[in-house]
């Protein structure tokens, strides 16, 4: 009983010291608009889904551009995997994962609110045929992290957009 009380007291002291130093959990970046429409994405695009999830906390994602204050149009959404290095026997040793995302932001009428942007991320990773399953899982994790990075960059750019009349 005494140990539990000491543990609780120590946890409370740690939280109080964190609050006292100004520590706060990261909050979503506030956006200067309430409604956004996403267009130009392929059906079931992983990047579009990641954007929808991230935007859900800061704006309402609407299906029709006429209902939105801002429209984000994907002009390019490519995920590529290429071989960077191989052995003399032809076995793959290193691959490169690359995501390209080009987009523009406009009003529902099509008036540009920002210059078109192109985001490109590339990451190299080692590959081993003897650990193919593990490398496949690592590749999927890398792609998730790259998409999260792109979503963060898009949200920061959207935070600087000022919708017409607002």
How should each PLM-predicted stretch be described?
Residues 73-118, 125-140, 156:
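Surface-exposed short loop/turn segments
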Residues 2-10:
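N-terminal export leaders
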Residues 31-78:
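N-terminal segment of the mature soluble domain
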Residues 133-166:
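C-terminal/domain-edge helix-coil "capping" segments
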Residues 15-35:
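Bacterial Sec signal peptide processing site at the extreme N-terminus
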């Amino acid at each position: 009983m005494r140990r539990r009380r000491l543990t609780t007291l120590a946890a409370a002291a740690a939280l109080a010291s964190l609050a006292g130093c100004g520590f706060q959990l990261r909050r979503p970046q506030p956006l200067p608009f309430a409604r956004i429409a996403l267009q130009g994405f392929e059906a079931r695009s992983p990047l579009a889904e990641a954007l929808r999830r991230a935007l859900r906390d800061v704006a309402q994602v609407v299906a029709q551009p006429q209902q939105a204050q801002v429209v984000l149009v994907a002009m390019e959404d490519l995920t590529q995997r290429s071989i960077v290095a191989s052995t003399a026997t032809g076995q793959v040793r290193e691959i490169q994962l690359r995501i390209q995302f080009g987009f523009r932001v406009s009003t529902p009428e099509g008036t540009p609110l920002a210059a078109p942007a192109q985001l490109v991320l590339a990451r190299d990773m080692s590959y081993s045929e003897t650990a193919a399953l593990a490398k496949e899982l690592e590749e999927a994790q890398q792609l998730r992290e790259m998409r999260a990075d792109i979503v963060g960059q898009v949200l920061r750019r959207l935070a600087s957009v000022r919708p017409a009349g607002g």
